[in-house]
Amino acid sequence: MKLYCLSGHPTLPCNILKFKSSTIMLDCGLDMTSTLSFLPLPLVHSTRLSKLPGWVTKDGNNQFEKELKECSGRVFVDSVPEFCLPETELIDLSTVDVILISNYHCMMALPYITERTGFTGTVYATEPTVQIGRLLMEELVNFIERVPKAQSATVWKHKDVQRLLPAPLKDAVEVFTWKKCYSMQEVNAALSKIQLVGYSQKIELFGVVQVTPLSSGYALGSSNWVIQSHYEKVSYVSGSSLLTTHPQPMDQTSLKNSDVLILTGLTQIPTANPDGMVGEFCSNLAMTIRSGGNVLVPCYPSGVIYDLLECLYQYIDSAGLSNVPFYFISPVANSSLEFSQIFAEWLCHNKQNKVYLPEPPFPHAELIQSNKLKHYPNIHGDFSNDFKQPCVVFTGHPTLRFGDVVHFMELWGKSSLNTVIFTEPDFSYLDALAPYQPLAMKCVYCPIDTRLNFIQVTKLLKEVQPLHVVCPEQYTQPPATQSHRSDLMIDCQPPPMSYHRAEVLTLPFKRRYEKIEIMPELAQSLVPFEMKPGVSLATVSAVLHSKDNKHVLQPPPKPVAPPGSKKRKRPAEESPETPPFKPLLSGSIPVEQFVQTLEKNGFSDVKIEDTAKGHIVHLQEAETLIQFEEDSTHIICEHDERLRVRLRDLVLKFLQKF
């Protein structure tokens, strides 16, 4: 069993498991941190960005100034943003049989995999994962395509050039594998390959293994996966949460008794309490509004935004914010808000009950009805007419490199009355803000990450007790900035196996058994022999027939009698007779009783010697040794076949035949 690691990002995994002649891809996350190396894509012409000076090397070389721009001491690529793909050279991706998706954040690289590698298999995911994943991809494509960039920078990627660049460009990994965004045509083609599944639904793969999605408690439709055969079980835990938010709670019971547990997608902010962060978010928002400023919340169009809107629904009246408009701007804003209300069966129990009252599961429906929350596809048209300040704007993208958020950063960045509040934990807020410096607006970092922390993981592993744990190397050591915090790493016994990008792990687990069916007519011919109370054995002479990964024992073919002929056949043409089977032996030989038997049969001067594997009986007079081991017996005597046979018969008296 082998695990191929194709991604270096622990919360955006992409691994391939080779298990019983099947090749299974576990997620295909897209690392978007690469876009932080690029300049933002403004919706309207930005004089500030267009006047940034080109980067010049220390020796005055200005050949890169068209591709690289400098802003407040940082160097950025002036080109269409590119994304860091999973490894494509480590294994032939056209050999992948199936792709299992755990949540909508972990499927953003799907079009690259399914449309550009020769992949012909099937993708499995839950319906909310597919629908919300579609929205995220659609939004991403829209953000990139609506601001076309004339030039495409490539010179800076050459190794001899990259090493001259300042950090972080100098340290960027696998820059030649970075790719521009896919098209909507590729998105639709990729999604057409997905087969929808429900929680606890068992899916057979080629008769080899069975895969089952389980609720992971993190997002709408998010799943952990159990991959098992008749005698082996692998659990894949990715992006899970034990907190009570809007999704169904995590199914932990089904993860028990795993031979291998692959663990990814833990919280990226292990020291931050999500409830505390939500409280901070609300108080900073209220403080800014009261002082006459605007609040900008860079966010994804699904996920944490539902919980933030629910908290604000309960908070705005008590905080005196009932007259403040809330704007949600995204090309998919309307679809996202509607989807959240119709996926009732994927919600936690309390929200499911509201559907039958009937009430909307999420309170943002009431915010929309009361005109406190308004949603728009973009900043043009209706939004321009309705726009009032001070206000709160939820919009994307959290990288601050593309989307409507770029416009608001340029619009509000010059005033210290305004505040940008970062709630998404996927990106460094300092790196996100770098191309907007110097910045007058206030910045607040309230990362809300409900995924498992290390304390919860340690408790979970003690409860489900897998034989082996496999995880990214980042989880086996404390963070570099907090090297003294040994509690910020996975603690389990035996210690977890770790992996990094482009590594192949041989998992410490060997297949020991295989299920085989036996034909009824063959079963009838068996004669069991009782070895001890409750245990019987029988010898089987059969033909093993394997097809479609099913194994069947069939009776051996009977020799075909040759057709009658007067012509005498040569001996070579006659059907060979099957030699009789030698009986199988079982049991153990009590050495002291065996020595007594030897003495009764005329052998004297017998000595016994203990060894690491058993005993040696030495017949000194006959110059013969008899070695007794757990699974074998050897009689060593030179040039006396009659003596050997005589001793063999004495040994056989102590063993059972069947």
From Swiss-Prot:
A Gene Ontology term for the protein's cellular component: nucleus
Region (Disordered) residue spans: 547-586
Localisation per UniProt entry: Nucleus; Cytoplasm
InterPro entries: Beta_Casp, Integrator_9su, IntS9-like_C, Metallo-B-lactamas, RibonucZ/Hydroxyglut_hydro
Motif (Nuclear localization signal): 566-570
Highest taxon in the source lineage: Eukaryota
Swiss-Prot/TrEMBL keywords: Cytoplasm, Nucleus
Pfam families documented for this protein: Beta-Casp, IntS9_C, Lactamase_B_6
GO biological process, one term: RNA polymerase II transcription initiation surveillance
Keyword Cytoplasm part of the UniProt annotation: yes
Keyword Cytoplasm set for record: yes
SUPFAM superfamilies: Metallo-hydrolase/oxidoreductase
Subunit description: Component of the Integrator complex, composed of core subunits INTS1, INTS2, INTS3, INTS4, INTS5, INTS6, INTS7, INTS8, INTS9/RC74, INTS10, INTS11/CPSF3L, INTS12, INTS13, INTS14 and INTS15. The core complex associates with protein phosphatase 2A subunits PPP2CA and PPP2R1A, to form the Integrator-PP2A (INTAC) complex. INTS9 is part of the RNA endonuclease subcomplex, composed of INTS4, INTS9, INTS11 and inositol hexakisphosphate (InsP6).
Reported function: Component of the integrator complex, a multiprotein complex that terminates RNA polymerase II (Pol II) transcription in the promoter-proximal region of genes.
Further information: Although strongly related to RNA-specific endonuclease proteins, it lacks the HXHXDH motif that binds zinc and participates in the catalytic center. Its function as endonuclease is therefore unsure.
Protein family per UniProt: Belongs to the metallo-beta-lactamase superfamily. RNA-metabolizing metallo-beta-lactamase-like family. INTS9 subfamily.
PANTHER family named among the record's database cross-references: INTEGRATOR COMPLEX SUBUNIT 9 (PTHR46094:SF1)
Record-given protein name: Integrator complex subunit 9
Species name: Xenopus laevis
